Regions:
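Extracytoplasmic/secretory soluble proteins
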Residues: 1-314
Length: 314
């Protein structure tokens, strides 16, 4: 599944085995093994592969896990606020943690393990790389859910998710992920509530909305598996993005889905520590204009440093 907030990394395990390379256990090994893997793939396929992340704005939780003071909180999608487990609040970009993350990314970029145009490449290029399995390691992406698409390109592909600093706790920063709500300012909020009530009232309603008509768009297989009718490109002919509305107890997975993917959704994680700020929601409305300006400045001034294009010292 989507394990970026937990710091997961996805590996082409078949290539690590083919080239007799180990799974990395720390940040330095991640770069060293990535560099070796990049050269081996280039020698074999004549292609240059890179590290890819899920989004430009997300924080490198996979790297944070390797730091001595882990766990700590940095907002996953906005990167403005840092909170340690004592409740101390700082501006993330002014912390030592950001400097170390920036230095790590700079090393990755200088060694050619990032796409040289990381700041400007279209998102669909990254999506294509991930869904075809053309990556050194997927950092919070390259998800197990892409496996049915990847094996169309590489029939012998094997995917495995792992974590640096194995044994350190996972960090729960949100009680709910990808939740749905109805804006109070909408003209007919009751209609939205009625739809959500219908959607989650039964497994049948849930499956109809997410997967289409049984027997026409998909065939149920057992309690939590299905086969979907797909296009030539491998996409389901009628399916709503599951991450937006799927309710885990009702979830279905393709018969070609990896068992590890199903387990990642249905099996609770062990060794989890809750962030001190879980449940607190910062109301940005009174400062919405200022907040928007901060986010715009973050992208203009901090992204080049964050992604290693410009060194922290410069």
């Amino acid at each position: 599944g989507y394990g970026g907030p937990n710091g997961s990394i996805t590996a082409r395990a078949d290539l690590l085995e083919k080239y007799d390379l180990p799974f990395p256990t720390n940040a330095e090994e991640l770069l060293d093994i990535g560099e070796e893997l990049q050269q081996r793939v280039k020698d074999d396929l004549g292609e240059t592969w890179y590290f890819w992340d899920h989004e430009m704005q997300v924080t490198p939780v996979y790297f944070f896990r390797t730091l001595d003071n882990w766990p700590f909180y940095v907002d996953y999608a906005e990167e403005i606020i840092y909170i340690d487990q004592e409740g101390n609040v700082e501006a993330y970009f002014e912390t030592e943690e950001f400097r170390m993350a920036a230095d790590f990314q700079r090393d990755m970029y200088v060694r050619g393990l990032r796409h040289p145009d990381i700041l400007s490449i279209p998102r669909d290029l990254k999506t294509q790389a991930n869904q075809s399995g053309r990556y050194l390691f997927g950092l919070g992406t390259g998800a197990l859910s892409d496996y049915p698409l990847i094996v169309q390109q590489f029939p012998d592909a094997e995917l495995e998710q792992f974590y640096l600093a194995e044994g350190k706790p996972f960090y729960e920063t949100l009680p709910v992920w990808n939740s749905n709500s109805v804006p109070s300012t909408t003209d007919q909020p009751q209609a939205g509530i009625e739809f959500l009530n219908w959607l989650y009232a039964s497994n049948e309603n849930h499956d109809l909305f997410l997967y289409g008509v049984p027997g026409e768009h998909y065939e149920p297989v057992g309690d939590d598996r299905m086969t979907q009718v797909r296009t030539e490109s491998g996409q389901a002919v009628d399916a709503h993005p599951f991450w937006q509305t799927q309710y885990v107890p009702f979830a279905n997975f393709g018969t070609d889905a990896l068992d590890a993917l199903v387990d990642s959704y249905l099996t609770p994680m062990d060794n989890v520590e809750n962030a001190i700020n879980v449940g607190f929601v910062f109301d940005k409305e009174p400062v919405s204009a200022e907040w928007a300006n901060v986010l715009a400045e973050r992208e203009a001034s901090m992204y080049p440093i964050k992604w290693g294009v410009v060194s922290y010292e410069d």
